[in-house]
């Protein structure tokens, strides 16, 4: 089997590429073209010699279709993901997340791809109206990012219903782990502590999230890809454990072995009506359809992430907040 992974140079994408190669899968990695010929996090992988790199742009239909030649399965992860920046440049999110997904779906349809695994996000649910959140929970995106991901999800499901394209939609809750951008809360906390800061700058401490280690998430992709009964389905992937951002910061500080104070930084707080107050996953459907369940606990994932960040601090700027 040959697979195409879009967004392969990014956080989850690079872990998925690594995992697929470990399973003996032939992988073509779709990487956004850049003049430096950088392959992003794929440069760090010991298995990079086993990966076929394809440089292009998810917004360019021709390059997307060309990348699908000889491919059986497409894992579509390419997206603009930073929520704060979606307030600054929402059109960029429409072009990448909605139009880019259309390009993937239409190219897959014309190329007779056997399976398409499309990546959603728990952000499309908005603040939980009930918990744990299952796939029947109302969709209520509260940021431009979430709105574009919701639109992309609906496109994917429509291609299944209208054209018979064998699409599955994976909806990961808050994935974390090595290689994640400091725009995400866990690496933000860790790098500030590792930099020796005694006061850690954060936004809303009361919001709760379901934090799922990245290796759990990529194993979920694998399981969904293996099971044809997931075609046409939306499938949540989460740890089924809820923690507030304040408690998360304290847990990380304990694991690092440091005492911290938390300072509320107003620029890190979302607009009031845009804040997602609570997320907690119900992964029953994933277990029933594919047999997937998370193998790594929050604490195990945090320890691995802390260890990795200690060795890779050169990639991060702890004192600069970048949306």
Residue map of PLM features:
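Glycine/proline-rich active-site loop of Rossmann-fold NAD(P)-dependent oxidoreductases
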Residues: 150, 175-188, 195-200, 214-215, ...
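Non-catalytic, hydrophobic alpha-helical segments
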Residues: 74, 217, 221, 237, ...
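Hydrophobic alpha-helix immediately C-terminal to the catalytic Tyr-X-X-X-Lys motif of short-chain
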Residues: 151, 155, 159, 189, ...
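N-terminal Rossmann-like NAD(P)+-binding domain of SDR-like oxidoreductases, especially those catalyzing
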Residues: 1-175, 296, 304-323
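Conserved C-terminal active-site "lid" loop/helix of NAD(P)H-dependent oxidoreductases
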Residues: 214, 234, 269-293, 304
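Residue-level signal for the nucleotide or nucleotide-sugar donor/cofactor binding architecture
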Residues: 59, 88, 96-99, 143, ...
């Amino acid at each position: 089997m040959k697979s195409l992974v879009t967004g392969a140079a990014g956080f989850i994408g690079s872990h998925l590429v690594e995992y697929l190669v470990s399973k003996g899968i032939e992988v073509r990695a779709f990487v956004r073209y850049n003049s430096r010929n950088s392959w992003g996090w794929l440069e760090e992988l010991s298995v990079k010699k086993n990966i076929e790199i394809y440089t292009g742009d998810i917004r360019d239909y021709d390059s997307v279709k060309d990348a699908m030649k000889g491919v059986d399965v497409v894992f579509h992860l390419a997206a603009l993901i930073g929520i704060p920046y979606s307030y600054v440049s929402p059109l960029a999110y429409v072009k990448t997340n909605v139009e880019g997904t259309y390009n993937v779906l239409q190219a897959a349809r014309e190329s007779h791809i056997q399976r398409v695994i499309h990546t959603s996000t728990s952000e499309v649910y908005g603040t939980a109206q009930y918990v744990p959140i299952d796939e029947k929970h109302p969709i209520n995106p509260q940021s431009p990012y979430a709105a574009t991901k919701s639109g992309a999800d609906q496109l994917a499901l429509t291609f299944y219903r209208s054209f018979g394209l064998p699409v599955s939609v994976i909806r990961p809750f808050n994935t974390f782990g090595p290689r994640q951008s400091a725009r995400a809360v866990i690496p933000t906390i860790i790098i500030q502590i590792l930099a020796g800061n005694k006061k850690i700058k954060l936004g809303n401490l009361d919001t709760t999230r379901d934090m799922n280690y990245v290796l759990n998430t990529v194993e979920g992709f694998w399981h969904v890809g293996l099971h044809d009964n997931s075609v046409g389905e939306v499938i949540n992937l989460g740890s089924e454990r809820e923690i507030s951002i304040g408690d998360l910061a304290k847990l990380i500080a304990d694991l690092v072995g440091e005492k911290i104070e938390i300072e509320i930084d107003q620029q890190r707080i979302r607009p009031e009506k845009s804040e997602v107050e609570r997320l907690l996953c119900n992964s029953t459907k994933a277990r029933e359809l594919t047999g997937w369940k998370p193998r790594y606990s929050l604490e195990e994932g945090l320890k691995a992430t802390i260890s990795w960040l200690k060795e890779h601090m050169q990639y991060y700027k702890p004192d600069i907040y970048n949306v």
